[in-house]
Amino acid sequence: MTQTLSQLENSGAFIERHIGPDAAQQQEMLNAVGAQSLNALTGQIVPKDIQLATPPQVGAPATEYAALAELKAIASRNKRFTSYIGMGYTAVQLPPVILRNMLENPGWYTAYTPYQPEVSQGRLEALLNFQQVTLDLTGLDMASASLLDEATAAAEAMAMAKRVSKLKNANRFFVASDVHPQTLDVVRTRAETFGFEVIVDDAQKVLDHQDVFGVLLQQVGTTGEIHDYTALISELKSRKIVVSVAADIMALVLLTAPGKQGADIVFGSAQRFGVPMGYGGPHAAFFAAKDEYKRSMPGRIIGVSKDAAGNTALRMAMQTREQHIRREKANSNICTSQVLLANIASLYAVYHGPVGLKRIANRIHRLTDILAAGLQQKGLKLRHAHYFDTLCVEVADKAGVLTRAEAAEINLRSDILNAVGITLDETTTRENVMQLFSVLLGDNHGLEIDTLDKDVAHDSRSIQPAMLRDDEILTHPVFNRYHSETEMMRYMHSLERKDLALNQAMIPLGSCTMKLNAAAEMIPITWPEFAELHPFCPPEQAEGYQQMIAQLADWLVKLTGYDAVCMQPNSGAQGEYAGLLAIRHYHESRNEGHRDICLIPASAHGTNPASAHMAGMQVVVVACDKNGNIDLTDLRAKAEQAGDNLSCIMVTYPSTHGVYEETIREVCEVVHQFGGQVYLDGANMNAQVGITSPGFIGADVSHLNLHKTFCIPHGGGGPGMGPIGVKAHLAPFVPGHSVVQIEGMLTRQGAVSAAPFGSASILPISWMYIRMMGAEGLKKASQVAILNANYIASRLQDAFPVLYTGRDGRVAHECILDIRPLKEETGISELDIAKRLIDYGFHAPTMSFPVAGTLMVEPTESESKVELDRFIDAMLAIRAEIDQVKAAVWPLEDNPLVNAPHIQSELVAEWAHPYSREVAVFPAGVADKYWPTVKRLDDVYGDRNLFCSCVPISEYQ
């Protein structure tokens, strides 16, 4: 039959690229699970009363090429002015070797958080390097890797200061008046829910204030002044006040380490180590503290440990501090960090080394000195005598200066009274400085760079002698070897080879949605039109961003059934926090601020109680019944008991147990009946899109994990984006911003992120995904995700019982395999199975969540039947191995499972095991072999012998 032109054009071609199983494979799986079609399967599984009659109207699909052309036209509306705004954001030069081999490399950006250290040694090493950079530059003992942005790090520093403070009755936090305004904004938001009073004043007046538990100072103030706080910090320490210092990572190359001056906590943004501004993010924040406070630190800490053979190996240390274990008692609700961006920054430091970094920092400072000398020579006054890269220039005709700057396509900082701010960076050239002279002085200034350079080279007093660094930095060999591109390329490849990412195998982590991150989706993030914009540039210069964000928000509104979307939160946990704050402020607006009880099912993700606690709520746990569903009787009892104090419920749908609960609407009705709001966690949105929606179900607010459902890659543990969708009554209470008015938002609430649109530069990924899939493709993706999960469940059911099922024995988009009976019978645990899967070439499913002793599997729609069968065959082969242990063919203490994973060096060592080398490393005929580089980690050793900086290079070899 002859095809029509429309059929030949095939605008939906990407749908088939994104969805792994083709039509024939889908039919084979449907036959295996006993369903006639995708629609029939969905109809059996999803409760009838929440199924959408028609899919959301987000348009028809577009090809990869058409979508890229459309987005390129939108991006071209952004105006790329040269930015001197500063305020914590500068232009950068990302080394091409890092751009090509990391940022554009799926071996780096598709990996997951390194909870399985045996398959994560490469990025763990890069993160350990990031911690070493932080330790060397801050002068402190312990560093994490990493936090979401500088402002979030400031809020975490405040919370940590209160945790460790010996002044238990003090409830005031002092912030120096010259911190960045966005930092103060986020600190105030966090302080409100904790009940802290924030005092903002000149730093030298801090001692005038009583009952202060912590102080936040900024080493280089927001308008550029370098502060020597040595004496002040000493006085504050004598009064037992915890001192936090915000620092500029590039300035720290030249300036005294705040830790050496006595600071307890030092943090800042690592953005200017190679990460583009990207209209606000994503960027990694560094965070360091004194050793005595290490167990109170937020964020992930990479530690050096040993594997089962005694070899040096890396792991995430002290995880008992984190939300997935401590829940509401966690130090922070942070789940996502900024691993990909932290690794870019760490490799930037590796590539340039201490000599290269000093040259870059000195060049920036020299150009700033030259600019300052020329302006002063012509009679302009600088507000500060001591500076690194930022001048605050007093100008009589400010309007005229700004007009000339705009004509020259230059952005200066304009919010300073009777002055302009100018921040230089590593991209600044001689020509740029001459252009700045013309803007500030007129074209006939008569200044010459070389003449000015001679003057300042002999007489630069802009950094106080006491503030000049006198110690060596980055002395570890890793920072002093890889300076040629060949060496750097090979080093990065050696790290990449140690890790398991989606470019090698499926990553079946339940509750994580490790789906395809398509190349076409990733291409726009490095376009200069998106990468080079400052988040505080004038809005008329960001019309492309505004259009793209507005379109994406409109699509998300339609897909979620909500009325508005706020793009600011830059992680799922931050989205939870923002959504709960919206609920809190909504209640307060109705004079019901006493509503502070948050109901959370026992099965909830650890971020839920941690976020509720951070939002100033009390957590009350609701029981689950024997089928894993919310116990309605217990829910009613807890809601009635809370009464007028009920704030909300946090519920995940489909449930964390991998089932579409039949009573979800009734759950919403019960909570609404008692005046509460419904927060529907968007973690499992991949089983809703196009089929149902949170708004249609009856929820009031949700966060969306764009790094799960909408294809932003996990990056080895970040970046992420967690925008929140809200019903109209909550829209006035979503986060605002103190620097930038967010168009269309009437909100006056405080910010939760440093930038108004969070990690804006990765939003094009989700825009591309929705545009290329269209309504038809998005629904089909959800349906195939459900099909793939049910196919795995049905084929593994006899070997590994599925713990929870819904109607007709079906699961949603993930399933929980119960290992407890096997462990009781044979002694083989879920940990043993997880590690043995590595020998078969797979990342393990999620272990012991949400139920201890289980494995939760989520295949996503992107995996083909071939890959699903490979995983199933591996699991069945492992079950046969367990039977060998059960039959005493292999002893419990010496078998392929308890000894897994196996590494190459074992093949040439003495072999005393009761199974062959072939069984160990090529089980069941595994051909495309992934080789882990370490054996099973010794977690106890790692936490008892905490070591979180770089080890001798010989230990890596």
From Swiss-Prot:
Presence of the UniProt keyword Oxidoreductase in the record: yes
GO cellular component: cytosol; glycine cleavage complex
Reactions that this protein is recorded to catalyse: N(6)-[(R)-lipoyl]-L-lysyl-[glycine-cleavage complex H protein] + glycine + H(+) = N(6)-[(R)-S(8)-aminomethyldihydrolipoyl]-L-lysyl-[glycine-cleavage complex H protein] + CO2
Top-level EC class as recorded in UniProt: oxidoreductase
Positions bearing N6-(pyridoxal phosphate)lysine: 708
SUPFAM superfamilies found in the cross-reference section: PLP-dependent transferases (SSF53383)
Single Gene Ontology MF annotation: pyridoxal phosphate binding
Catalytic activity, EC: 1.4.4.2
Cofactor: pyridoxal 5'-phosphate
Function: The glycine cleavage system catalyzes the degradation of glycine. The P protein binds the alpha-amino group of glycine through its pyridoxal phosphate cofactor; CO(2) is released and the remaining methylamine moiety is then transferred to the lipoamide cofactor of the H protein.
Name of the protein: Glycine dehydrogenase (decarboxylating)
